[in-house]
Amino acid sequence: MSFRVDGDAGHELEIIDNVSLRVDDGEFVVVTGPNGGGKSTLARLIMGIEQPTEGVILFNGRDITHLSVTERARLGIGYAFQQPPRFKGLTVRKLLSLAHGSTLPEDVCCNYLTEVGLCSKDYLNRELDSSLSGGEVKRIEIATLMARNPGLAIFDEPEAGIDLWSFAMLVDTFKKMHDKGENSIMIISHQERIMMLADRILVIDHGRVRTDGSRGAVLPTLLGEFACECDFREAAK
């Protein structure tokens, strides 16, 4: 699959360059790599927010390349944005029920919020408006995706805007989701603690797959690269 956009002087920019990716049932895949390498674009292509210039996207054997975001969501693909939208007039409790497809009991809604580090009594009846911080909205969206329980759950940098305590709870939540084996999980992240949960790690660099392998094969090399980069920065001070 490839994705290009118009650049300067009529030249096309290759954002995703002939990338092939397979996520098996129940598999946990982390996509990582340098900033601007194409990771988030890959996730947006899978969700249907962007359309590939070339190639096809299959979900459970069905060609979904030209399906809309809504149609893909109905088939069982869920997506948590880096910067989630706000819905003035809609309460958190109502949003969770809408995501689930039916009215959820209060205790179930509370459990979803607790799992993402939010005090349920403080948030259950709040509206998704400008009174919520970016980090709060981010956590609510992740809880919403959990309530939907999609076949493929895509999280785009879920750690963004979240404090360390809440992040620890999120990591535990992702582990529980994976242990259940009900969902395939794809997370865009640089975080070692998230990569430690992965079955497989995919490294995207300049729109291409640089590395694709098991956590045991890929993570030690990545950590070595990070250590070298930190040593270089320290020496340059």
Task: Locate each region found by the language model.
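ABC ATPase NBD coupling module
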Residues: 63-78, 222
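The feature captures the beta-strand-to-loop junction immediately N-terminal to the Walker
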Residues: 32-34
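Q-loop/switch helix immediately C-terminal to the Walker
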Residues: 83, 89-105
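ABC ATPase C-loop
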Residues: 145-146
